[in-house]
């Protein structure tokens, strides 16, 4: 990987939780390619995790942000403008839902959790994109993360699947809005990875095994796989790509049924 690919570029990473996060894989790939990074966090508990990781990548810009609060989002970008005069890329790796409502039936989703899930997991990308646009006068790239549960029904995903479907639609509309200004907007649909967010999904080990046995590549992806694909979408290598949902899932999304050589899996 060329360490000059992202030289001179500055990017904001939102949603880093720990060194198992997909956001960490993306941040590492961008940093290794020469990018200068800033990070946001929500709450003191996450600051204790994010700050040391930011320092590993040579960043001292770690700023608070509650994406559910419009004033907090504005304050984040005001603080970022005090440090940088421009922003070249944005990574939105944020989603949340009450894990108790991811089990059982989608039809039993409460109104409160539905609204909260859509606000944090979907609208937040639009909110931060609106602020980031102002720091991209010469164009840039925005990226969010989604999952195959937006396209097909997946176990224990429920309202998050609905939210990710809305997020994918948002990517297309944002791409249209911002394209005339040279700003590209894309998504990565990553296969299942053991992350903090995944811990709220029931039978996740079963999902991992199923994906491994039935994907064309016969393996699960990892954060480095996603990081390298994100680097492509965030760099000038993808200068003609916008409104795209790139699947990084070992090809699982093309499969129509269980592979003939896949062993049976018992739920644990």
Regions found by a protein language model. Name each.
Residues 15-24, 95-130, 134, 138-180, ...:
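Catalytic loop of short-chain dehydrogenase/reductase
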Residues 215-226, 237:
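A conserved structural motif in NAD(P)-dependent oxidoreductases
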Residues 54, 65-74, 78-83, 92-115, ...:
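Conserved mid-core segment of classical short-chain dehydrogenase/reductases
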Residues 185, 189-200, 248, 254:
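Short, flexible catalytic-loop segment of classical short-chain dehydrogenase/reductase
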Residues 3-39:
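Canonical Rossmann dinucleotide-binding motif of NAD(H)/NADP(H)-dependent dehydrogenases/reductases
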Residues 179, 184, 241-243:
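Short, small/polar-rich loop/turn modules that mediate ligand/substrate recognition or access, typified
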Residues 31, 85, 136-137, 176-181, ...:
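A short hydrophobic alpha-helix cap/turn motif
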Residues 231, 242-268:
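Short C-terminal tail/terminal secondary-structure segment
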């Amino acid at each position: 990987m060329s360490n000059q690919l992202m030289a001179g570029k500055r990017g904001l990473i939102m949603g880093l939780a720990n060194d198992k996060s997909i956001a960490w894989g993306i941040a590492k790939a961008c940093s290794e390619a020469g990018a200068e990074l800033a990070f946001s966090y929500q709450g003191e508990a996450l600051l204790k995790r994010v700050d040391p990781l930011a320092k590993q990548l040579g960043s001292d810009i770690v700023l608070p942000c509650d994406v559910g609060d419009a004033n907090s989002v504005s304050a984040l970008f005001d603080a970022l403008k005090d440090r940088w005069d421009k922003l070249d890329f944005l990574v939105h790796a944020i989603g949340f839902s009450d894990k108790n409502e991811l089990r059982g039936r989608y039809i039993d989703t409460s109104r409160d959790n539905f609204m909260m899930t859509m606000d944090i997991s979907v609208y937040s990308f639009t909110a931060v994109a609106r602020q980031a646009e102002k720091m991209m006068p010469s164009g840039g790239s925005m990226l969010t993360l989604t999952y195959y549960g937006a396209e097909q029904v997946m176990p224990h995903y429920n309202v998050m699947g609905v939210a990710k479907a809305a997020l994918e639609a948002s990517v297309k509309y944002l791409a249209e809005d911002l394209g005339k200004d040279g700003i590209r907007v894309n998504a990565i649909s990553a296969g299942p990875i053991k992350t903090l967010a995944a811990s709220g999904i029931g039978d996740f080990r079963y999902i991992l095994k199923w994906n491994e046995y039935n994907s064309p590549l016969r393996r699960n992806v990892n954060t480095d796989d996603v990081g390298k694909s994100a680097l492509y979408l965030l760099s000038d290598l993808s200068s003609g790509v916008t409104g795209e949902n790139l699947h990084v899932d070992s090809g699982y999304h093309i499969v129509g049924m269980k592979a003939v050589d896949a062993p049976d899996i018992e739920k644990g």
